[in-house]
Amino acid sequence: MDYGLQEGSRVLILWDGQVKADVLTELVRRIQATVKDDKLCQVENSQQLGKSHHQTSSFDAVLLGAVTPDMRPTSDCLVDLLSLLKPNGKLSLQLTKTDLDCDKLVYNLKLSGYVDVSMGSSTDLVEIKCSKPNYEMGSSSKLPFSSAVSSNQKSSADVSKIWSLSAQDVLDRDVELVDPDQLISEEDFKKPDPSTLKASCGGEKKRKACKNCTCGLAEELDKEAAAKVQPKSSCGNCYLGDAFRCASCPYKGLPAFKPGEKIVLSEDQLAADS
């Protein structure tokens, strides 16, 4: 397989599993002879790739499976290799056909960010070549919108003027406007009857005010409860004074008061005499 190496290229050989020393030694010798520098060829186990601390964008080519073609690269491994390659760097894969899903591998390569993916095969091996894009992953580029000259400047100017037109400029004579004074009638300004605003809290069952009641039912129930506690006279003369009160009158001992005046009695006064 032609790896497309040149003099000065920095190469990473990736292996996994059981490696034959003579095969690895021969491959390293061939690559060193091509790049003309022994230090430019490095060998790495794929299992230790994340711990190797290689600099990003530091390799011109990565050879995967050239020594151990039975290896199967994971998606994480492909992403890590992409970060190690320089822009336009090459990734070459040589893998055995046994239990190899070529379509899935090509899909994972494209999904990881590789471009120019091409596949070939020999008797026992599948050979795949791909490249890193000619830019760094995550880099940004300014689009030349500001320098572009519009071919239809007059049309653009007319479009921009539309936003500055007033309502009278765009209205047709046949279009009838709604009179804003007719949107709200006199009935809308009338204050509603409070009785119509009360909610049917509880329906026909025992009325119970809701929590944080706003319809007035809570105040009404409080008044009813206070009226039940307030003692009522059976003779109607309690307000005149003790001379007109019965012996069991709860107001006994209190000064005379006006009819309808609210009198607060203590619990001792409400208790029956023993």
Curated annotation (Swiss-Prot):
<protein>
    <recommendedName>
        <fullName>Anamorsin homolog</fullName>
    </recommendedName>
</protein>
<keyword id="KW-0411">Iron-sulfur</keyword>
<feature type="binding site">
    <location>
        <position position="213"/>
    </location>
    <ligand>
        <name>[2Fe-2S] cluster</name>
    </ligand>
</feature>
<keyword id="KW-0004">4Fe-4S</keyword>
<keyword id="KW-0408">Iron</keyword>
<comment type="function">
    <text>Component of the cytosolic iron-sulfur (Fe-S) protein assembly (CIA) machinery. Required for the maturation of extramitochondrial Fe-S proteins. Part of an electron transfer chain functioning in an early step of cytosolic Fe-S biogenesis, facilitating the de novo assembly of a [4Fe-4S] cluster on the cytosolic Fe-S scaffold complex. Electrons are transferred from NADPH via a FAD- and FMN-containing diflavin oxidoreductase.</text>
</comment>
<feature type="region of interest" description="Fe-S binding site B">
    <location>
        <begin position="235"/>
        <end position="249"/>
    </location>
</feature>
<dbReference type="GO" id="GO:0005758">
    <property type="term" value="C:mitochondrial intermembrane space"/>
</dbReference>
<keyword id="KW-0001">2Fe-2S</keyword>
<feature type="short sequence motif" description="Cx2C motif 2">
    <location>
        <begin position="246"/>
        <end position="249"/>
    </location>
</feature>
<comment type="similarity">
    <text>Belongs to the anamorsin family.</text>
</comment>
<dbReference type="GO" id="GO:0051539">
    <property type="term" value="F:4 iron, 4 sulfur cluster binding"/>
</dbReference>
<feature type="binding site">
    <location>
        <position position="235"/>
    </location>
    <ligand>
        <name>[4Fe-4S] cluster</name>
    </ligand>
</feature>
<dbReference type="InterPro" id="IPR046408">
    <property type="entry name" value="CIAPIN1"/>
</dbReference>
<dbReference type="Pfam" id="PF05093">
    <property type="entry name" value="CIAPIN1"/>
</dbReference>
<feature type="binding site">
    <location>
        <position position="249"/>
    </location>
    <ligand>
        <name>[4Fe-4S] cluster</name>
    </ligand>
</feature>
<feature type="binding site">
    <location>
        <position position="201"/>
    </location>
    <ligand>
        <name>[2Fe-2S] cluster</name>
    </ligand>
</feature>
<comment type="subunit">
    <text>Monomer.</text>
</comment>
<dbReference type="GO" id="GO:0046872">
    <property type="term" value="F:metal ion binding"/>
</dbReference>
<dbReference type="Pfam" id="PF20922">
    <property type="entry name" value="Anamorsin_N"/>
</dbReference>
<dbReference type="InterPro" id="IPR049011">
    <property type="entry name" value="Anamorsin_N_metazoan"/>
</dbReference>
<dbReference type="InterPro" id="IPR007785">
    <property type="entry name" value="Anamorsin"/>
</dbReference>
<dbReference type="GO" id="GO:0051537">
    <property type="term" value="F:2 iron, 2 sulfur cluster binding"/>
</dbReference>
<dbReference type="InterPro" id="IPR029063">
    <property type="entry name" value="SAM-dependent_MTases_sf"/>
</dbReference>
<feature type="region of interest" description="N-terminal SAM-like domain">
    <location>
        <begin position="5"/>
        <end position="145"/>
    </location>
</feature>
<feature type="binding site">
    <location>
        <position position="210"/>
    </location>
    <ligand>
        <name>[2Fe-2S] cluster</name>
    </ligand>
</feature>
<dbReference type="GO" id="GO:0016226">
    <property type="term" value="P:iron-sulfur cluster assembly"/>
</dbReference>
<feature type="short sequence motif" description="Cx2C motif 1">
    <location>
        <begin position="235"/>
        <end position="238"/>
    </location>
</feature>
<feature type="binding site">
    <location>
        <position position="215"/>
    </location>
    <ligand>
        <name>[2Fe-2S] cluster</name>
    </ligand>
</feature>
<feature type="region of interest" description="Fe-S binding site A">
    <location>
        <begin position="201"/>
        <end position="215"/>
    </location>
</feature>
<feature type="region of interest" description="Linker">
    <location>
        <begin position="145"/>
        <end position="189"/>
    </location>
</feature>
<keyword id="KW-0479">Metal-binding</keyword>
<feature type="binding site">
    <location>
        <position position="238"/>
    </location>
    <ligand>
        <name>[4Fe-4S] cluster</name>
    </ligand>
</feature>
<keyword id="KW-0963">Cytoplasm</keyword>
<dbReference type="GO" id="GO:0009055">
    <property type="term" value="F:electron transfer activity"/>
</dbReference>
<feature type="binding site">
    <location>
        <position position="246"/>
    </location>
    <ligand>
        <name>[4Fe-4S] cluster</name>
    </ligand>
</feature>
<keyword id="KW-0496">Mitochondrion</keyword>
<dbReference type="GO" id="GO:0005737">
    <property type="term" value="C:cytoplasm"/>
</dbReference>
